[in-house]
Amino acid sequence: MKKFTDLPYVRPNIEEVKKDFRDQVNLLKNAITFDAQKQAITQINRINAAVDTMSNIASIRNSIDTTDKFYDEERTFFDENGPEISDINFEYYTALANSKFKKDLIAEFGNQLFTIAEYRVNSFSKDIIEDLKEENKLGSTYSKLVASAKIGFDGKELNLSQLAPYAQSSDRKVRKAAAEARYNFVAANADKFDKIYDDAVKLRHQMATKMGFKNFVELGYLKMQRSDYTPEMVANYRKQVLDHIVPLAVKIRKKQADRLGLEKLKHYDLSYFYPSGNPKPKGDAKWIIDNGIKMYRELSDETGEFFDFMTKNELMDLETKKGKDVGGYCTFIANYGAPFIFSNFNGTSGDIDVLTHEAGHAFQVYSSRNQKINEYFWPTYESAEIHSMSMEFFTWPWMGLFFKEDTEKYRYEHLASGLLFLPYGVAVDEFQHAVYEKPEMTPAERKDT
């Protein structure tokens, strides 16, 4: 395989893609043997993989440099044409669900393919194609807005990722100032953020009602492929977190306040765990990767092979820089069987969390790269977190490589942060339910929810 920077990018000819795809769907519909259907499915997967490969290469390069006009235009191209591909996939999944060789296909590919097909059929309609294009456009607008941050702080011009280490400063005044600088950026752009979100909520409600749903909650569950649980079960889970995790979270925060000698934690104290300073990796990005190679080789032959593949082919872009999108993610370049990890290293313990969390996603999809059908490259959205969170803890025995004398400090902070995330995570989930159940709320009313 070539290095990522050398991978060719060619914009797909959407009309040719649609014609080739529909030809295979017609073969699938009209097949008189199981083998003929299986061959059509193989070809459909080939077409989808080719389009996904170009889409992901363009998306990665755009997120690495959001100011690159060429890949900005390519992202816009896929924003506009992705729903057209969803339309022909809808035809494929409908034909699949109605196959007269369904039992044979289940024996060959498993029942999960048909569960996914059912959810994708039920979450799509030709009536919402233009809405989906607009939704994609809103997502891209949001990414550009966040990446545009140029915050004057400590005599430097910083983006949001570069500002983050100051939120863990041992100087409380610096932590407070960093928080204010972050929120000043948000406040200065509040109208833009509010409009993007308000437009998205109303657009999603419109899509849901067009398809016969009461609101976006039902459609959202289908799009997330939540096939094993309902809103009622999720509400019960939130109650369990409230009853069992929140009391523990309160104790963790109380101990944190005591360690810091504070009567009460403020929002700008939450990321600061120790009066002696938070644990940090003891080297730069190259040093972290070199130790990552050692760690994954010692963890298992399989993880060693995987991480060597990632480093050899430069399938990671890790350091924060101007114009780069925020956050971190893992994606998959199907035609090369190659995961890609995107991150924003900033000298905090979060750099190691990314090295393990996103590598958990990447190792999972690398292990699944030879699946017969594209739908099995990834688990469903939330099931995927099993692999990433597991890798964070599988690698605990090697944390000494990165944190040296601060290893136990890191382990405590890491475990405590994992527990503290649970109340936050379910609060976000409950907020989403509230927002989509009452799409008529104004931005101000949402903020008060």
What residue spans do the PLM features occupy?
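Long, amphipathic alpha-helical stalk/connector segments used for oligomerization, subunit docking
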Residues: P397-T449
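Long, K/E/R/D-enriched contiguous segments that form extended
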Residues: K264-N291, Q364, M399, K409-F421, ...
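Auxiliary, metal-adjacent structural segments of Zn-dependent hydrolase domains
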Residues: R259, P275-Y336, T348-S349
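Active-site recognition of the HExxH zinc-binding catalytic motif
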Residues: S343-S368, S388, F393, F431
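A well-structured
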Residues: M1-N278
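Post-HExxH zinc-binding segment in Zn-dependent metallohydrolases
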Residues: D243-H244, S368, P379-E408, H414-A416, ...
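Short beta-alpha connecting loops at secondary-structure transitions
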Residues: F340-N344, Q371-Y381, Y410-S417, V435-Y436
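Long, well-ordered alpha-helical segments
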Residues: Y197-A208, F213-K214, I252-R253, G360-N370, ...
